[in-house]
Regions:
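Acidic-leg catalytic submotif of subtilisin-like serine proteases
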Residues: 145-193, 200, 205-206, 210, ...
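Short acidic, glycine-rich surface-loop motifs adjacent to enzyme active sites
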Residues: 252-278, 301-302
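Autoinhibitory propeptides
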Residues: 29-37, 53-143, 153, 325
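Subtilisin-like serine protease catalytic core
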Residues: 69, 150-185, 191-246, 260-266, ...
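Bacterial N-terminal signal peptides
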Residues: 10-20
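Bacterial N-terminal signal peptides that target proteins for export
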Residues: 1-11
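C-terminal subdomain of the subtilisin-like protease fold in secreted/lumenal serine endopeptidases
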Residues: 35-37, 223, 264-270, 367, ...
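Extracellular S/T/G-rich loop segment that most often corresponds to the catalytic His/Ser-adjacent loop
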Residues: 168, 318-413, 417, 468, ...
């Protein structure tokens, strides 16, 4: 074996050969979809070069020798953000020190302008433009319907002692946040600067207000979820609401490195970009997984790409990092400004699963995100550009009403803060796995207008039930330390608005399912070191490992896992199914619906080649939905639906 210095020299000397002699086929394999498409333009591209494990120093030297300016080093993913000319791309990506290349993609927030009043239900595929007049005085309801529908009208915790790292456009230092913005750093323009809190766009301020803006109905117009929570503001979006993936990764790395200093418990990511590669190689997903392994609960928006230009419901529109297995991926629901859940619907724009390439079931759950009032940044671009979305309170204070999975993500971050305080009070750790499991298990399944339960690709396990989740974690018996012992015993129901709602009692995780009363037991699956993609959990049985030939679970004769899977009478998975390329799921597990929320008659959904460029939206006249055989895929352009404004 060559000594390290000799190997470095060999690597450097070999680069000149690599530049001219890259194997096109293998180099193409190392490029994500965005880079492959970008090559056609012939323009230089911002790239994240991913070094092989242990090759970081070699990669850095190689780039220095070639005179490449490294815009950002990303140690959590072994990445180097650089700009490469079109002719250099394949050579660098093919270099032996690199595992692959990803585009340093533009990330954007996942909010969309609210254009209709929540009390109105437009006809299918239609949007009614009923935005109130600019600065119309908003009459607040006697009780916050947001808190009411979450079951939080009389909750004991407010998120005290919990810190949320808000990775967004910033936070306007409104009195609503008091002295609870503990630190603020700006990651835009390739630098990290400590600054006074600010927000020149306005998106982050709105999300922060939903999480923990201390506003009460007697002196303002809305109520947040966790009024005592602290913030660390990490600005990655500029005044136009755009940022770079590398800046988001640096902010995540900062949160991990400073977790103890700022006591960071939660990261809120109400932003993303289209999925261009499998989760295992996606730099943004890998950074999220690092944060989760560090014990930080990462709450991520699913995206606003759930409907096509013509109003047809589309699937596989989840954005990155919403495809991160450990992330709490949140879709949006419309709670119709009522407390009860019977009229709640999945917001039409909310992105649906499965995730591109991997076929993960996302979102994990949905939460109110439609037409929500929150703090405004008066000097921000949103406030200035969309005056029709301003609402003036009786006190004369202006705020904004926005919609999107950005908003629902903020709501869930607030709920997680409440759970975190509750578990701190009980002296046990709320791990990312346990947080997701509790929220999924206690979620209340939503139904469409016809009374049909939405399938998991649209709502995960259902609408977040803060009261149920809080009740569950506060009733855990912390004296139970032995694995497999029951640590709680309670009825799986929650009363909201004087009505009783059953919990989902399901946990859908990647391509695995937890079913039954598993959450009631102190199990290793809730620990930090468990990667759910490798495990199957069903009822009271746990079998670890990747070998499908040796896994059998359940007490019923009709459940067997081997080379072939027979799941009840409804689903058959055999050797002909290749995850990541073709997937067939029976309709009793996933009920696909068309644009009119009608269930398809066919027994399955088929996904074609997931490496293709596009999504083929559902056809009302077809018996199934097929993705991936055509070049006419549209990545969730809802500009037409929103009157030409596009998504935020």
């Amino acid at each position: 074996m060559l000594p390290p210095n000799s190997r470095l020299v060999v690597a450097l000397l070999s680069l000149s050969a690599l530049v001219g002699l890259a194997d096109t086929a293998s180099a193409q394999d190392k490029l994500d979809r965005a880079l492959r498409e970008g090559q056609r333009s012939g323009k230089a591209q911002r790239v994240i070069l991913k070094a092989k494990p242990g090759y970081d120093a070699w990669a850095r030297k190689l780039l220095e020798q070639r005179g490449k300016n490294v815009d950002a080093e990303l140690p959590s993913v072994g990445g180097f953000a650089v700009e490469l000319a079109a002719g250099e791309l394949e050579a660098y990506c093919h270099a032996s020190v690199f595992d692959g290349c990803s585009e340093d993609s533009i990330v954007r927030p996942t909010a969309a302008p609210a254009k209709k009043k929540p009390s109105q239900t437009p006809a299918p595929n239609k949007v009614i433009n009923t935005a109130p007049a600019t600065n119309a005085v908003y009459s607040a309801p006697a009780v916050s319907t947001l808190l009411g529908t979450l079951g939080l009208t009389a909750y004991d915790f407010g998120g005290s002692g919990v810190t949320v790292a808000l990775i967004d456009s910033g936070i306007h230092p409104s009195p609503a946040f008091g002295n609870r913005i503990k630190a603020f750093y700006d990651f835009t323009n390739g630098r990290i600067r400590q600054r006074t809190a600010s927000d020149d766009y306005g998106h982050g301020t709105h999300v922060a207000g939903l999480i923990g803006g201390r506003q009460y109905l007697q002196d303002a117009e809305f109520q947040c979820v966790a009024p005592s929570v602290n913030f660390v503001g990490l600005k990655v979006l500029d005044r136009n609401g755009a940022g770079r993936t590398s800046d988001v990764i640096r902010a995540i790395e900062f949160a991990i490195a400073n977790k103890a200093l700022f006591k960071i418990d939660i990261i809120n990511l109400s932003l993303g970009h289209p999925i261009f590669e499998p989760a295992a190689t996606d730099p943004l997903v890998r950074a999220v997984e690092k944060a989760s392994k560090a014990g930080i609960i990462v709450v991520v928006s699913a995206g606003n790409h759930g409907v096509g230009k013509d109003g047809e419901i589309g699937f596989a529109g989840t954005t990155s990092p919403g495809n991160a297995p450990s992330a709490l991926t949140v879709g949006a629901s419309d709670h119709k400004a009522t407390i009860t859940r019977d009229d709640d619907r999945v917001a039409v724009y909310s992105s649906n699963g499965p995730t591109w390439y991997d076929g993960f079931v996302k979102p994990d759950f949905v939460a109110p995100g439609h037409f929500l009032a929150s703090e405004a940044a008066p000097q921000g671009a949103l406030f200035k550009t969309y005056p029709q979305l301003r609402k003036r309170g009786k006190s004369g204070k202006d705020f904004m009403q926005l919609s999107g999975t950005s908003m629902s993500t903020g709501v869930v971050s607030g709920v997680v803060a409440l759970l975190k305080q509750a578990t701190n009070h009980k002296h046990f750790m709320l791990t990312p796995n346990l947080a997701k499991g509790v929220l999924q298990y206690t979620a209340i399944p939503l139904e469409d207008e016809a009374g049909n339960v939405y399938n998991p690709l649209r709502q995960g396990t259902g609408g977040v039930n803060a009261l149920g989740a809080g009740t569950l974690v506060t009733n855990i018996d912390t004296t139970v330390s032995s694995p497999n012992q029951a640590w709680l015993n309670m009825a799986p129901v929650t009363v909201i608005g004087h009505q009783q709602y059953l919990w989902s009692k399901n946990i859908v995780w990647g391509d695995n399912i937890v079913w039954g009363e598993t959450i009631y037991y102190n199990l290793p699956i809730w620990a930090l070191n468990i990667v759910w993609g490798d495990n199957i959990v069903w009822g009271d049985n746990i079998v670890w490992g990747d070998d499908a030939d040796n896994i059998v679970w359940g007490n019923d004769d009709n459940i067997v896992w081997g080379n072939n899977i027979v799941w009840g009478d409804n689903i058959v998975w055999g050797d002909n199914i290749v995850w990541g390329n073709n997937i067939v799921w029976g309709d009793h597990l996933l009920r696909p619906v068309d644009a009119l929320n009608r269930a398809f008659n066919d027994d399955n959904i088929v996904w074609g080649n997931l490496d293709d460029d596009n999504i083929v939206w559902g056809n009302n006249d077809d018996d199934n939905i097929v993705w991936g055989n055509d070049d006419n895929i549209v990545w969730g352009n809802i500009a037409a639906l929103l009157g030409g404004r596009g998504s935020w």
